[in-house]
Design a protein with these regions (language model features):
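Structured C-terminal subdomain patch of bacterial secreted/periplasmic proteins
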Residues: 182-200, 204-207, 291-366
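A short, structured surface patch at a secondary-structure boundary
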Residues: 49-53, 59-144, 150-156
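C-terminal segment of classical bacterial N-terminal signal peptides
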Residues: 14-20
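Bacterial Sec-exported substrate-binding components of ABC uptake systems
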Residues: 20-93, 204-232, 355-366
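Positively charged n-region of N-terminal signal peptides that target proteins for export
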Residues: 1-8
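Extracytoplasmic ligand-binding site segments that recognize negatively charged/polar headgroups
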Residues: 83, 90-96, 108-119, 159-162, ...
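Flexible, glycine-rich surface segments
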Residues: 214-215, 221-303
Length: 366
């Protein structure tokens, strides 16, 4: 009996110390996020931070000279502030521009001629940012010879796992951003906070996001207009590509006080947010839409009403054509990942009948 009691007491003495040996360092703070759901950041004493993205990415962000928090020794490390970044995600560069961090970017997967944002095109033409190959075929020799502190990919790289493995094999940390999975348009913009933390520009990132959030809140307070909107483009084969209910463009139309005119679509068979339907189906659903918005990014802009009507003889019978409510997107709109709040504000102006003919993201087709 006495021996058993001694054994129990010994275990009670040893257990706390064993627990302490395996204890993880205490989290001292967490990045405040209002809309983004696909990443989180925990802070630790000494400046280290733990970054989680999606369900299977876990990193330790480690400033120079900072100690590794207990329990996080096994995590892959990203030195911060990161320099010489390779942005293989086309949605990221605009966010770097808005927080004045292009000087931390060394490489892009988009060529100069394919940029519609003047500042990014100029940065590449002036060779402040270099083209390092598209995401699926990076220029490994260039990255090795000039150095690369971090590779930022989008989820397309998941279809090319060998590329990610090769980059990591060469010693480059690879981060896959999931901003396109954010359910709220402002969630996409809030990824600027992560990029700010990675580059030492968090105050600038937070200030930009706060301005965008205020712009959004101003538009959100407006009453629903009841106006229906068809956002589309016509393919070279004559089909019409429209947005599904779950797509973020449809979500922005709704947040702006409008309603999508396209509601009768087949059940989704994949994760794509678009659907190509026959012109006859589009005509039946969008003929009486209050507003038509043509997506110039996919197949080119329409400079005037004559060019728009030349796309299909059926378009002349649409209500929005008769009322002068046909709009076209500016070519840079989809590269401006920072502009969600501005897009919502301009969409609200369009559906409420208060828009000028020329906006930053749209223009009226006349």
């Amino acid at each position: 009996m006495r021996r058993a009691l001694c054994l129990v007491l010994a275990l009670l003495v040893l257990l706390p110390f064993g627990g302490m040996a395996n204890a993880e360092a205490e989290v001292t703070g967490r990045m405040a996020l209002d809309y983004a759901e696909n990443f989180s950041v925990d802070y630790y004493d000494g400046g280290a931070a733990r970054l989680r993205i999606g369900e299977n990415q876990d990193f330790l962000l480690l400033p120079a000279g900072a100690a590794v928090p207990a329990g996080l020794e096994a995590l892959p490390r990203i030195p911060i502030p990161a320099e010489k970044l390779y942005l293989a995600s086309s949605s990221a560069p605009d966010l770097f521009l808005r927080m004045d961090a292009l000087d931390t970017v060394q490489y892009s997967s988009t060529t100069a001629e394919n940029w519609r944002i003047p500042e990014l095109r100029a940065a590449m033409e002036e060779e402040r940012i270099w083209y390092a190959g598209k995401y699926s075929a990076p220029d490994y020799e260039l990255l090795l010879s000039e150095g690369c502190g971090l590779v930022v990919e989008n989820t397309m790289i998941l279809h090319n796992p060998a590329v990610k493995e090769k980059l990591e094999e060469l010693g480059f940390p690879v981060l896959i951003e999931y901003s396109s999975y954010e359910p709220h348009p402002l969630g996409r913009v809030e990824w600027i906070k992560l990029y700010g933390l990675l580059t030492g520009r968090l105050p600038e990132a937070e200030a930009f996001f706060d301005r965008q959030a205020e712009t959004f809140r101003s538009a959100e307070q407006a009453a629903p207009s009841g106006k229906t909107v068809a956002f589309f483009h016509i393919t070279p084969s004559g089909g019409v590509t429209v947005r599904r209910r779950a797509d973020y463009i449809t979500r922005m139309i709704e947040l702006a006080g409008g309603e999508t005119a396209i509601t009768d679509l087949p059940e989704a068979e994949n994760a794509l947010s678009t659907e190509t339907i026959q012109m006859e189906s589009f005509y039946a659903q969008a003929r009486d839409a209050d507003v038509l918005i043509y997506n110039s990014t996919a197949v080119g802009a329409v400079p005037d009403m004559e060019a728009f009507l030349a796309l299909s003889p059926l378009l002349a019978d649409f209500r929005a054509v008769r009322t002068g409510e046909v709009w076209c997107t500016e070519k840079s709109m989809f590269q401006r990942s920072s502009a969600a709040a501005d897009i919502i504000r301009e969409l609200h102006a369009i559906v409420s009948g208060e828009a000028d003919d020329q906006l930053s993201c749209f223009y009226r087709v006349k």
